[in-house]
Amino acid sequence: MDQENERNISRLWRAFRTVKEMVKDRGYFITQEEVELPLEDFKAKYCDSMGRPQRKMMSFQANPTEESISKFPDMGSLWVEFCDEPSVGVKTMKTFVIHIQEKNFQTGIFVYQNNITPSAMKLVPSIPPATIETFNEAALVVNITHHELVPKHIRLSSDEKRELLKRYRLKESQLPRIQRADPVALYLGLKRGEVVKIIRKSETSGRYASYRICM
């Protein structure tokens, strides 16, 4: 196997690990063994006899943990798909959207290699209450939430949000904002109106929390 292919497989393996971590961090059941799948095992499982990755085989379903269901009753199951095609057109995206609809997934995560055509992107917001999210493989090679400068973000439930606003006598409009396009908001799958608790380290007080609403 040539070095270029080895590098590409290594990057894909790291992107796969980030997706597993992301799904786990959202409150879905993913084992630590799945997250820590060694590179050699990844190759054996997801590459053909010529050493070429078979992205379609990397797709998986995840279900919420019991703790997540108690906090987020509408969470539902999730489907992740890695696309074999370098460029994604309407036909491929339509097949993905129909799969999410027919199998009653609450969330569909579509991981693509190079680009998605504008026409295909128009299908993304087309199936409420289900949500379709798209991620570029290259953006997943490194898990941004593991960077030392990125503080811990925790999504609040509706009850926790209500309690927060009541405790501090705030209106939603008074909370600082986090944009839906923010990398951490995308990582957590935040929706408009949801609140995150952000825990930062402080030299004087150990740790302190702030809150932002997704807009």
UniProtKB/Swiss-Prot annotation:
Transmembrane regions listed in the UniProt entry: none
Location within or outside the cell: Nucleus
Keyword ATP-binding attributed: no
Alphabetical UniProt keywords: DNA-binding, DNA-directed RNA polymerase, Nucleus, Ribosome biogenesis, Transcription
Coiled-coil residues: none
Entry keyword annotation includes Transferase: no
Cellular component GO terms held in the UniProt record: nucleoplasm; nucleus; RNA polymerase I complex; RNA polymerase II, core complex; RNA polymerase III complex
Molecular function GO terms recorded: DNA binding; DNA-directed RNA polymerase activity
GO biological process, one term: RNA-templated transcription
Predominant localisation class: nucleus
Domain of life: Eukaryota
NCBIfam families to which the protein is assigned, alphabetical: PRK09570.1 (NF007129)
Assembly notes: Component of the RNA polymerase I (Pol I), RNA polymerase II (Pol II) and RNA polymerase III (Pol III) complexes. Component of the RNA polymerase I (Pol I) complex consisting of 14 subunits: RPA135, RPA190, RPC40, RPA14, RPB5, RPO26, RPA43, RPB8, RPA12, RPB10, RPC19, RPC10, RPA49 and RPA34. The complex is composed of a horseshoe-shaped core containing ten subunits (RPA135, RPA190, RPB5, RPO26, RPB8, RPB10, RPC10, RPA12, RPC19 and RPC40) where RPA135 and RPA190 form the DNA-binding cleft.
PANTHER family in the cross-refs: DNA-DIRECTED RNA POLYMERASES I, II, AND III SUBUNIT RPABC1 (PTHR10535:SF0)
Physiological role: DNA-dependent RNA polymerases catalyze the transcription of DNA into RNA using the four ribonucleoside triphosphates as substrates. Common component of RNA polymerases I, II and III which synthesize ribosomal RNA precursors, mRNA precursors and many functional non-coding RNAs, and small RNAs, such as 5S rRNA and tRNAs, respectively. Pol II is the central component of the basal RNA polymerase II transcription machinery. RNA polymerase complexes are composed of mobile elements that move relative to each other.
Protein name: DNA-directed RNA polymerases I, II, and III subunit RPABC1
